[in-house]
Amino acid sequence: MEETESSTQTPVPQHGISLASYPVRAVIRMRRKIRTLKKSRLQLDLTGGRSLDSAKASLRRQISMDRATLFKSSTYEKQQYFNFDTPTLEKLALNSQIRKRNRKKSRHVLYPGNVRKCLPVEHKSKAKRCLLLFIGIVCFQILNAIENLDDNLQKYDLDGLEKTLQREVFGQKRAIEKLMDHLQDYLATHYHNKPLVLSFNGPSGVGKSHTGRLLAKHFRSIMDNDFVLQYYTMHNCPNENDVTQCQSEMSGLISEMISRAEIEEKIPVFIFDEVEVMPVALLDVLHRYFQLNQSNEYLNAVYILISNIGGNEITKFVLQNASNDFLNLPQELHQIVISSLQKHHSLWDVAEIVPFTLLEKKHILDCFLDELLREGFYPDHSNIESLAGQLRYYTKENKEYSISGCKQVVAKVNLLQPYT
């Protein structure tokens, strides 16, 4: 009765093995195969007459080979076949992370067991040392050049010149600053690509010729008299009939002085006054020395041209801008003066214009005070006011500008001498 009941029951399916993974099933099959091979080979070896030891060794080799095959099959991943499906962003991110992780894994350095462990020596390139040496040489040359510039400026004592001009030239602060800027830039080195040509322009009595005399005195004290030339047109070439002779004399003086200066590595200074009355033939001679297409020694020279050309234009400009600070309008004033100079001669195309403006009454008082002290008079303020009141002035916007500048100051002071 019990047998019939048990036979009628439905058999329970064996899910234990079917649920196992593929490597587990492979292990089970291999174990069964090993048992069968053991039995079959032992029987064959015993029946064939082989020794038991050789049979065991053969069996061990077979077992080891089977285990290796089993390990490969258990770690084998399912092959991925190529298809044309576009990978998703998640797969791409996962692959990039795997690659980065593999890249970060540092390779271990294998050291022999009987030596000291140390990292391999990195061979440094010698180009870096050469580059550092080259940079050092360039920096040294730059510092040396800067020191040479300072030496040149000290040789000409431009600081002392600037102090002298500020002390003895009144009412021309802007002109002095511009003059010193040009001299400092040019005299800082001995090698140039063009000569320095400066043009002092302004009305009469504002200090142009006085500045020229101070420049000549200063450079004669720094250099010899052989390297400074003062040329007054009315004195050196008074007759128009002697223009040809004046041309040869001027050319000879300039060439000889430049040659001597080049030998001693000095820069000569040529000061030409009263240029407004200089004949055109002499202006042409000067113009040839201002050109760029000449030998190097002629490029190392300073030429100063002093004239009243453009004085009327400067006077009108100052009176029209009396209410403003016309010192802040240098470009407009420069254009007015240069247009007047270019009508006179083309040599001013290469000149640096330094305009001298009108002097106010306070500057005339300074001129009288300086002249009185120079002549040994007691500087009485009331006496100075009386002398300054004898001059004529332009009156504009509550400002008084002297018509004749400081030109009559010396004559007025000389009139006081008989009464002392």
Curated annotation (Swiss-Prot):
Membrane topology: Single-pass membrane protein
Domain of life: Eukaryota
GO terms, molecular function: ATP binding; ATP hydrolysis activity
GO CC entries: endoplasmic reticulum lumen; membrane; nuclear envelope
Listed transmembrane segments: 130-150
InterPro entries linked: ClpA/B, P-loop_NTPase, TOR1A_C, Torsin
Subcellular compartments: Membrane
Binding of ATP, residues: 202-209
This protein's UniProt keywords: ATP-binding, Membrane, Nucleotide-binding, Transmembrane, Transmembrane helix
Pfam families associated with the record: TOR1A_C, Torsin
PANTHER family: TORSIN, TORSIN-4A
Family of this protein: Belongs to the ClpA/ClpB family. Torsin subfamily.
The name this protein goes by in its record: Torsin-4A-A
Source organism per UniProt: Xenopus laevis (African clawed frog)
